[in-house]
C-alpha cells in the first residue's frame, strides 16, 4: 500500500556523497565592534597538495609559535587558531583582533616561515608530543561516541588513522618544511571573511567582494 511504499522509500540508503556547490564571496561584515575576526580559508587539495598527518603537528606549531607570537603576542589579538582536514579544507583565524591588514600579511607569511622552519630536536619532539597528546586525550563515553560517529560519517578507516599516527610520530623538520607547499596551495585560493569594525573594513574594502553591515 501507499504507507508501506513510503516507509520503504524512507529507508533507502544514500547512494553517494552530498555535494554542496560553494562560491567565493570574500565578505566583510561591518559592526560597531572595535576588534576583528579575521579568517583566511582554502582547499589545498584543489590547489594540488595532499593531506598528511604532519598537518596535525603544524596546528600545534602555529598555535604555540608562528600565529601565537605574531597575532597574539605582537599583534594584541585575544587568540588565533588553524585547522586542516582530510578533504583539503584549511583555515587560519584570529579573534578579537585589533588588526586586519597586518593579520592578512601574517597569514601570507606562513609559507616563508615553513620554508625556513628550523628548531631544536627538543622543540620538535615537544611539538610531536603535543600533537599525540591531543589525539590520545582521555574521553568519556559521550565523547567516544561523538568521535566514532564523526569518523564514520567522514568515512575514516582504522587504516587511515594508523597511517596518520605513523606520519606524526615519524615526522621531522624536513616534513614540516614540505608543508609550505600545502599552505601555498591553500592561500592561493585567496578566500577570506572578516567581521569587524566599520573603520577597519572601510580602510581595507579592496580586499572584499562584498561588504555588508550587521545590525
Where are the regions that the model predicts?
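An aromatic/glycine/proline-enriched structural segment found at the starts
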Residues: 1-36, 199-215
